[in-house]
Amino acid sequence: MSKMRVEVVSTEQLIFSGEAEFVVAPATEGEIGVYPQHVPLLTRIKPGVLRLKVPGTKEEVLVAVSGGMMEVQPSLITVLADTAIRGEDLDEARANEAKRAAEDALKHATDDMSTAKAHAALAVAIAELKTLDYLKKRAH
């Protein structure tokens, strides 16, 4: 099968650098699947699960992303994420607590700015929990 180079970078560090047979990303208009030789494009990504299919295996690398940009070239995909955490590095208890705190902040938000921050934090926590759910399903 054909493959492409994929680079996933957060503001803090390089998260993934390697080859993939395909990539599924949470674009703002819906999930987008990208195979090698895809037509070039630039898209915003929203909080969600980035899935990278590792060549020659059934393995997928899962990354929780909080948003950012994805550039697609025929043989290279670059994801510039605001924050990104590999699935195996996520902490379920911390993600659940972050979700609870964001929901609480949303209930007590008094202005547009605090409401927007709470919505953003909630979206990130949900993306992390969704990534953990993918990992659990894959283990079965």
From Swiss-Prot:
* Keywords attached to this entry: ATP synthesis, Cell inner membrane, Cell membrane, CF(1), Hydrogen ion transport, Ion transport, Membrane, Transport
- The protein in question is named ATP synthase epsilon chain
The membrane topology term of the UniProt record is: Peripheral membrane protein
Instruction: State the superkingdom.
Output: Bacteria
GO cellular component term of the entry, any: proton-transporting ATP synthase complex
The subcellular location is: Cell inner membrane
**SUPFAM superfamilies with a match to the protein in the record:** Epsilon subunit of F1F0-ATP synthase C-terminal domain, Epsilon subunit of F1F0-ATP synthase N-terminal domain
* An example Gene Ontology molecular-function term: ATP binding
Protein task: Produces ATP from ADP in the presence of a proton gradient across the membrane.
Keyword hit for Cell inner membrane: yes
Question: According to the entry, what is the taxonomic lineage of the organism?
Answer: Bacteria, Pseudomonadati, Pseudomonadota, Betaproteobacteria, Neisseriales
Query: InterPro entries under this entry?
Result: ATP_F1_dsu/esu_C_sf (IPR036794), ATP_synth_F1_dsu/esu (IPR001469), ATP_synth_F1_dsu/esu_N (IPR020546), ATP_synth_F1_esu_C (IPR020547), ATPsynth_dsu/esu_N (IPR036771)
Coiled-coil annotation: which residues? none
Origin organism of this chain?
Answer: Chromobacterium violaceum (strain ATCC 12472 / DSM 30191 / JCM 1249 / CCUG 213 / NBRC 12614 / NCIMB 9131 / NCTC 9757 / MK)
